[in-house]
């Protein structure tokens, strides 16, 4: 019964009905949330509750849709491993997101209440009041001082009006006695300064607003706010005609900055306090969108991360299937993966397939060589026997009957043609025999530079139209080898190079010996026609040739001799005309082989 219920519940929760139900619920709750937010009298707790429900529904819906999507993909022969990892990423992202959302909103609400506590508001308000009281007190004192100075100057009108020097002296005395930082008497009619204290700055009526002058005409001191670092009062002198007194005191910059900072902080605090409900709602909405974004980022990251792991494995499986079907040319791209365990696996797979391919190729070549070796022995025996009498008979005919034949030149041409082709056949048979009976090398110490240079000089004498060049980075080099076989290798390579230059007025062959560390290379470069691209990969196979004079066993013999001497034969075409053949001997391996064979 329990298993039945479990099965049915699982079927229900993975069905489309639940997804459809959640989608309808998401629409309903989204509309309800919008309605609650749009009300004039907002209830923050209700709005937060609706937003949290919206978040939970969207997260669950996202997880179910993701699971449904990958379940359908798995039915389409997609990777089950990839689906499991993505679903795990989704769940791991969704559950903590819901928990963190609830606690974040709760703690944010507590923090906001702490920020806008009544005590903090009271302290800020008191600070503003104290700052304003300080300025107000200074203004009141300056106002009283302005009235007192104006009274004194009015009383001395007759003494001062015609004596500017006395006027200035009296004004300075008043300023000093009453601790004024500046005192200026201005004439409105002439727009001139009648008198001023020593530390006063020049000032004109142009800098004083007209409405303040009209206000001062009423007989009361008026504050002039022309400089934030000073408190100034303007008052009209009673006995004088259009004459005004301006007095001022400096306020400490630190006090002004402190007052400005206090007022700014209080204004900003009250502005935030008035907007707190909107801030809380905006924060909640923002957090929900961030939570949803994080969820979808986590799912996307899961898809990308899983694809990065599963895709290389899929390629490896595909390549393995091809190998199983007999394709040993398949390789997995190592440059598409990181240098981690997957990269190591790719490299190992490629090495393994290359080794299998090489072993298969070597096996085929060995089987072919063995078959041709048997054929060569029989064919050589069957052909060589009649060749000798044919050749001898042709030579005797040429000697004996040449004087008696009327068409002597034509007769000689025919016989020479027979002799030449007989020699060609004889050379082919010799190649057959050499390939079939190539003996094991007899290793002795030989001076390689002398050996190669001697062969180059000999070939140079036989080919006047070819420029030979020999270079070596060592003067001499003792080399364990079969000198006869190495001699045969060099002759074969140089003959091939000469044949590729045939038909041209001139050519060039370069032979280089390069000794470096535990390797020594012999490189032959020619300016001939090179190898056809389709044959360059199998030029060393038996009976593959581009020449009409041979059977294609020359390079096959060279390769066998080089490999017997622990070397590698590399054949390539040059970018310009010609070919390059590089023989590279591994001296360490050669020493081990010679040591084991007792050579």
Curated annotation (Swiss-Prot):
The keyword Phosphoprotein applies. It comes from the Bacteria. Keywords: ATP-binding, Cell membrane, Kinase, Membrane, Nucleotide-binding, Phosphoprotein, Transferase, Transmembrane, Transmembrane helix, Two-component regulatory system. SMART domains: HAMP (SM00304), HATPase_c (SM00387), HisKA (SM00388). CDD domains: HAMP (cd06225), HATPase_NtrY-like (cd16944), HisKA (cd00082). GO terms for molecular function: ATP binding; phosphorelay sensor kinase activity. It comes from Rickettsia felis (strain ATCC VR-1525 / URRWXCal2). Residues 378-589 form the Histidine kinase domain. InterPro entries: HAMP_dom, HATPase_C_sf, His_kinase_dom, HisK_dim/P_dom, HisK_dim/P_sf, NtrY-like_N, Sig_transdc_His_kin-like_C. Disulfide bonds: none annotated. The keyword Membrane applies. Member of the two-component regulatory system RF_0427/RF_0895. This is Putative sensor histidine kinase NtrY-like. The modification Phosphohistidine is found at residue 381. It is found in: Cell membrane.
